[in-house]
Amino acid sequence: MYRIGLGYDIHKLVEGRELIIGGVKITHEKGLLGHSDADVLIHAIIDGMLGALALDDIGTIFPDTDPKYKDIDSTVLLKHVYDLIKSKGYSIVNIDSNIIAQAPKMMPYIPKMKTRLCEMLGIENHQLSIKAKTKENLDSVGQKLAIEANAVVLLEKE
């Protein structure tokens, strides 16, 4: 049996925070505002994984009202959700994702993101797609006020 899930996340860019996307530190003058490290790509992947199994979303499982998640590394959350899907007898077939940002340019960082995420999720490079898009100067992302990501996750019952 196959299950598919769609994940999405957006965070505001602010001064005084590191920019972490896909578990990789990105050189930029601003970072993403959030209760955790605000890693939009990992959050989108997590929501896609949870959605594929019709489970609660990331905000319900890791509420921003819980101090134990304050500034937490999103890779810790991803590992928890990965272990959850494995415990339910599922494995990842593939993940297709987009990072949407006007700035900074993501392409130089994507190979490192893929390596990091593939290692964490026990998948091969050909099972994970990370693409970089812009908003052509439109909306909050296009005006460099935010960064968003989406991900489609396909799971298979083992």
Show where each model-derived region lies.
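C-terminal edge-of-domain segments
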Residues: 141-158
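Mid-sequence acidic-hydrophobic segments that form the walls
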Residues: 84, 116, 120, 154
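Short, conserved loop-to-beta-strand elements that form functional interface hotspots
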Residues: 96-101, 109-141
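RNase III-family endoribonuclease catalytic core
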Residues: 2-111
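Short, surface-exposed, polar/charged, turn-prone segments marking secondary-structure boundaries
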Residues: 32, 48-49, 121-127, 156-158
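A glycine- and small-aliphatic-rich helix-loop capping segment at beta-alpha/alpha-beta transitions
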Residues: 18, 116, 144-148
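Short beta-strand segments
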Residues: 7, 129-133, 154
